């Protein structure tokens, strides 16, 4: 049954991958008419994204395998780290390639300053990636160890916004929801800033010397979001008592069934002659 579920997941993901590749080809072709540097970055971004997806497919059998943790669940911390890593690495590589076309030397092409605020965001993401498994392992019980091994517990996108414990696995985790929105909004906002950087730079004369800076307040909010995510994950939770079980000392109807008793014949009862 597990094999069938995995095969079904792979079949459902394949059409999206094909559409992604076709859309990427069309998009890069259109961007070549707008800005060469922007086209280089978008092409690099799509290439790195495809490599990440392909690695997941090769090593786990699932195109989204890089987002799946050891519990067979979609991990929000993995999702966040992958988004920031692909975004920043693709922009750095594209900027280096664009600079190389102008500077004609490797030293000048790699002279790109990355703002400390951006490094702080990457550090916060990696901290959440490393801290989430530590928190979960510290509170793991016998029931939690078996979670994710059943065919019905295949990875789903909803895993990134649902609780990690057995007690809240079917409920939305507010700490995950807020962190998901923070991540998406910041990635889109910084992606727009990178688009402006690549479009406004003069590809014939100037090189790209630094990435767009981030506000310290934004980094602080991002850090608070991730801290809340880890702290809420560390809170112990227990299942409510099973109401189907009878309280201690109370007998069930089966226990109240009278046992078969032997009734001695009444000595005054009339005897049937043989």
Residue ranges of predicted features:
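Loop-to-transmembrane boundary segments
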Residues: 6-19, 72-87, 155-187
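Short, surface-exposed polybasic-aromatic patches that bind anionic ligands, especially phosphate groups
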Residues: 25-28, 33-41, 48-50, 99-108, ...
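Membrane-proximal cytosolic segments adjacent to transmembrane helices
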Residues: 1-10, 64, 124-170, 222-274
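An N-terminus-focused feature that recognizes amino-terminal "leader" regions
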Residues: 12-67, 76, 117, 197, ...
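Alpha-helix capping and helix-loop boundary segments enriched in small/acidic/polar residues
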Residues: 9-13, 114, 118, 148, ...
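Compositionally biased, low-complexity linear motifs
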Residues: 87-101, 144-148, 245
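Short hydrophobic alpha-helical transmembrane segments
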Residues: 21-24, 48-58, 81-95, 112-140, ...
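A cross-kingdom feature marking solvent-exposed beta-strand/loop segments within repeated
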Residues: 60-76, 94-118, 163-167, 197-217, ...
């Amino acid at each position: 049954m597990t094999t069938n579920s995995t095969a079904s997941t792979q079949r459902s993901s394949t059409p999206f991958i094909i559409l992604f590749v076709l859309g990427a080809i069309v998009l890069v072709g259109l961007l070549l008419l707008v800005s060469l540097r922007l086209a280089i970055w978008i092409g690099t971004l799509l290439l790195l994204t495809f490599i990440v997806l392909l690695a997941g497919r090769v090593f786990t059998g699932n195109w989204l395998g890089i987002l799946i943790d050891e519990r067979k669940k979609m991990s929000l911390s993995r999702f966040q780290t992958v988004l920031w890593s692909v975004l920043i690495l693709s922009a750095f590589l594209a900027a280096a390639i664009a600079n190389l076309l102008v500077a004609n030397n490797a030293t000048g092409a790699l002279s790109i300053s990355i703002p400390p605020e951006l490094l702080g965001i990457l550090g916060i993401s990696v901290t959440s990636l490393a801290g989430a498994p530590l928190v979960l392992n510290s509170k793991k019980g016998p029931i939690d160890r078996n979670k994710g091994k059943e065919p019905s517990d295949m990875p789903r996108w909803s895993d990134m916004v649902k609780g990690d414990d057995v007690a809240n696995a079917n409920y939305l985790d507010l700490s995950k929801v807020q962190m998901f929105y923070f991540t998406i909004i910041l990635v889109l906002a910084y992606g727009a800033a990178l688009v402006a950087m690549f479009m406004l730079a003069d590809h014939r004369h100037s090189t790209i010397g630094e990435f767009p800076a981030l506000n310290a307040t934004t980094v602080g909010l991002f850090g608070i979001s991730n801290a809340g995510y880890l702290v809420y994950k560390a809170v112990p939770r227990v299942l409510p008592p099973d109401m189907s079980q009878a309280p201690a000392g109370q007998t069930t109807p089966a226990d109240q069934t009278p046992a078969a008793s032997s009734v001695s014949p009444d000595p005054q009862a009339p005897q049937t002659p043989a």
